[in-house]
């Protein structure tokens, strides 16, 4: 397990939990003071953020545990389960916003002290932007699905806070239904983010192959290696931070077993240099046992 991976994803999960808690406290005060349904929407979203981020923090720590006798491939799939759980949390908050927004659209109420709401929303926007910037950096370094899921819903928070600012400004000028309309729009965006997040989590749980550029990098390494005539049955997937890579190398029939093994070891090390921490399995096939239509067909 890459030590940097564990350190970065743990810090990202902890940072998200602390930020969500701080924003919840601020938004409770702002909603109580202004009565804004848009700020209530943001408050509910912060409650969901805390639940999701706490879940993330616990699951990330569990997923970083090394493989054991019962989980020989490690615990990385826990990250995908966390992302799926987050999508459910967020979908629930979106439905709540729809109901609240419709109620206030039918019976709009004047907002109290919109300036306080604007100040609080600006503070929330800046804080969330800083968190998302940090999370994006962690995702770029680790490709953690759990942190990426967390980042997606905090990105939706940034958009939501921007929409709330506009709604508060319009309400200040007497357009009281704007608050409810923006709450409905925010609900649509949150629901979209949740569905996208759930789709990505399910794809990971179903062992979707690595991205095209990563598979192509593996093909390029193998195709250029001396002594390798071709390859087939390339299979890839990812569980947490670990990439699983399997393939068959095609070699000359008269190649000594020791030399064939050495070539396979060299190819494996080259792949590991490109994708550190991967689990690589390589099988060596004499060219004569590989059907002609299959020779050199990496993905078949």
Swiss-Prot record:
One of its GO terms (cellular component) is plasma membrane. It comes from the Bacteria. It is a multi-pass membrane protein. Keywords: Cell inner membrane, Cell membrane, Ion transport, Iron, Iron transport, Membrane, Metal-binding, Transmembrane, Transmembrane helix, Transport, Zinc, Zinc transport. It catalyses: Zn(2+)(in) + H(+)(out) = Zn(2+)(out) + H(+)(in); Cd(2+)(in) + H(+)(out) = Cd(2+)(out) + H(+)(in); Fe(2+)(in) + H(+)(out) = Fe(2+)(out) + H(+)(in). It is found in: Cell inner membrane. It holds the Pfam family ZT_dimer. This is Cation-efflux pump FieF. Divalent metal cation transporter which exports Zn(2+), Cd(2+) and possibly Fe(2+). May be involved in zinc and iron detoxification by efflux. GO terms for biological process: intracellular zinc ion homeostasis. The chain crosses the membrane at residues 12-32, 39-59, 82-102, 114-134, 156-176, 182-202. Belongs to the cation diffusion facilitator (CDF) transporter (TC 2.A.4) family. FieF subfamily. GO terms for molecular function: cadmium ion transmembrane transporter activity; ferrous iron transmembrane transporter activity; metal ion binding; zinc efflux antiporter activity. InterPro entries: Cation_efflux (IPR002524), Cation_efflux_CTD (IPR027470), Cation_efflux_CTD_sf (IPR036837), Cation_efflux_FieF (IPR023783), Cation_efflux_TMD_sf (IPR027469), CDF_Transporter (IPR050291). The gene is fieF. It comes from Cronobacter sakazakii (strain ATCC BAA-894). Its main location: membrane. Zn(2+) binds at residues 45, 49, 153, 157.
């Amino acid at each position: 397990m890459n030590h940097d991976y564990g350190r970065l994803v743990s810090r990202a999960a902890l940072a998200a939990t602390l930020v969500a808690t701080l924003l919840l406290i601020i938004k409770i005060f702002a909603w109580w003071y202004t009565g804004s349904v848009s700020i209530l929407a943001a408050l509910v979203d912060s409650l969901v953020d805390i639940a999701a981020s706490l879940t993330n923090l616990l699951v990330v720590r569990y997923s970083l545990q090394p493989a054991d006798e019962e989980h020989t491939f490690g615990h990385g799939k826990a990250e995908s389960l966390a992302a799926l759980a987050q999508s459910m949390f967020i979908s629930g908050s979106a439905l709540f916003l729809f109901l609240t927004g419709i109620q206030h659209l039918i019976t709009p109420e004047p907002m109290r002290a919109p300036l306080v709401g604007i100040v609080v929303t600006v503070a929330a926007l800046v804080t969330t932007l800083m968190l998302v910037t940090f999370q994006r950096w962690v995702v770029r370094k680790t490709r953690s699905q759990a942190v990426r899921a967390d980042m997606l819903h905090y990105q939706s928070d940034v958009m939501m806070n921007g929409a709330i600012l506009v709604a508060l400004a319009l309400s200040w000028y007497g357009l009281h239904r704007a608050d409810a309309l923006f709450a409905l729009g925010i609900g649509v965006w949150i629901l979209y983010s949740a569905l996208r997040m759930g789709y990505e989590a399910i794809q990971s749980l179903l062992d979707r192959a690595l991205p095209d550029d990563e598979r192509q990098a593996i093909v390029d390494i193998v195709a250029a290696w001396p002594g390798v005539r071709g390859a087939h049955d390339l299979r890839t997937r990812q569980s947490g931070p670990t990439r699983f890579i399997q393939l068959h190398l095609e070699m000359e029939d008269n190649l000594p077993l020791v030399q064939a093994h050495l070539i396979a070891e060299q190819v494996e090390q080259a792949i590991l240099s490109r994708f550190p921490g991967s689990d690589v399995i390589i099988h060596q096939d004499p060219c004569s046992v590989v059907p002609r239509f299959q020779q050199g067909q990496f993905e078949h």
